Amino acid sequence: MIQIMNWFSMVIGLIPLNRQQSETNFILDYAMMCIVPIFYVACYLLINLSHIIGLCLLDSCNSVCKLSSHLFMHLGAFLYLTITLLSLYRRKEFFQQFDARLNDIDAVIQKCQRVAEMDKVKVTAVKHSVAYHFTWLFLFCVFTFALYYDVRSLYLTFGNLAFIPFMVSSFPYLAGSIIQGEFIYHVSVISQRFEQINMLLEKINQEARHRHAPLTVFDIESEGKKERKTVTPITVMDGRTTTGFGNENKFAGEMKRQEGQQKNDDDDLDTSNDEDEDDFDYDNATIAENTGNTSEANLPDLFKLHDKILALSVITNGEFGPQCVPYMAACFVVSIFGIFLETKVNFIVGGKSRLLDYMTYLYVIWSFTTMMVAYIVLRLCCNANNHSKQSAMIVHEIMQKKPAFMLSNDLFYNKMKSFTLQFLHWEGFFQFNGVGLFALDYTFIFSTVSAATSYLIVLLQFDMTAILRNEGLMS
């Protein structure tokens, strides 16, 4: 599905033809990105200046239809010209930089998976795959229906010249939605990389309670290992030759005393009974020395990967974030006027004017379509942020368990502590946003609904009966 969207984006001039190749023909790469906007401007000027063709020139188009058509057309012009100018800005450089960084990240992830022996396990994500394909299929069906309705209505009205009014009606919203589709794809790729890092960190977290270092008891005073002093019966028998048989009872008592001392030393060296009461609360597992690379050896690489993916998120947001602003603004305006026309016009005089019904339904269809695209953008941006935060939470959980590899090597502890501290700075520094005007998360929905409610309260107070009566739509 993403390949279809990329090819369609190339055809309508939203991305360069050879975006992943550096040494190509510059004119050929950016030809469609110049031809299509010029053709759009020609159609826009043809309708607004020459007055040769257009929905507003028809006799059956009343004042409400003309107002709706002008608003839809000029808002689409603002949306399309804005995203086109932003698409020309370092568009090819972004694709090359994104692919290069993504390849480096994937190479390190594969190396970490080999170290953690996760490449031998077949990871299934059926649920995520079904949701992913269903989302793209649903969007494809919605856009197909919107384009079919607009093209069919315009063809019945203008015949073979229907492509001219189509370029100034639905085409700008289609182009803006495709750009947001590119943003959705890149954010989903970033979110998947965060998920892979979290899987590797979770494997370390699961192994933290089952893999320990061997314990060695040291004598604090001598700064060395405790050594036992053993007394053998041979030594005692040798003493008999020098002291005589009369001291036999004395040596027997001394043997018993030294054997008791030896038993006490053995009890001091035996730490197996105290292991169950350890503050670290380890499981009853066999303590063995780690010989070779284990999952925790990936920690330094995983921390670097996390920073690289966050840096990739910054680049992606810098490329597509400015294009979210005009799209969200167009979605907001179209949705408000779609509700207004549906409630104040179509409910009262629906079916009495074909062109008025066409404009009303066009507002409703594209308001629903743009809202769906905006919601998916917000959802994926929230998912990417949540996966990024989950990495820090897993690392913090590992630190709370105090595994042996962290206690025996200060490098791991310092790395984990630095990572959690650095993530706090990242969290305050970056979040997916629209050039700082609003954050791309679920709070944007609440803000938009609140603002739309305020505007609708004002708009719905207008009395449309007099206007509709003057247009002959009401008796």
From Swiss-Prot:
It is a multi-pass membrane protein. Disruption phenotype: Impairs avoiding all nonvolatile repellents tested, ranging from quinine to denatonium, lobeline, caffeine, and N,N-Diethyl-meta-toluamide (DEET). Also displays increased male-to-male courtship. Residues 243-281 are annotated as: Disordered. Residues 56-68, 150-158, 341-357, 463-475 are extracellular. Residues 251-264 have a biased composition (Basic and acidic residues). Residues 1-34, 90-128, 180-319, 379-441 are cytoplasmic. GO terms for cellular component: axon; cell body; dendrite; membrane; neuronal cell body; plasma membrane. Keywords: Cell membrane, Membrane, Receptor, Transducer, Transmembrane, Transmembrane helix. Expressed widely in gustatory receptor neurons (GRNs) that respond to aversive chemicals. In larvae, is expressed in neurons of the terminal external chemosensory organ, and the dorsal, ventral and posterior external chemosensory organs. One of its GO terms (molecular function) is ligand-gated monoatomic ion channel activity. It is found in: Cell membrane. Its main location: membrane. Residues 265-281 have a biased composition (Acidic residues). InterPro entries: 7TM_chemorcpt. The chain crosses the membrane at residues 35-55, 69-89, 129-149, 159-179, 320-340, 358-378, 442-462. One of its GO terms (biological process) is detection of chemical stimulus involved in sensory perception of bitter taste. It holds the Pfam family 7tm_7. Gustatory receptor which mediates acceptance or avoidance behavior, depending on its substrates. Required for sensing all nonvolatile repulsive chemicals, including tastants, pheromones, and especially N,N-Diethyl-meta-toluamide (DEET), the most widely used insect repellent worldwide. Also functions as a pheromone receptor for a male inhibitory pheromone leading to male-male courtship suppression. PANTHER family: GUSTATORY AND PHEROMONE RECEPTOR 33A, INVERTEBRATE GUSTATORY RECEPTOR. Belongs to the insect chemoreceptor superfamily. Gustatory receptor (GR) family. Gr66a subfamily. This is Gustatory and pheromone receptor 33a. It comes from Drosophila melanogaster (Fruit fly).
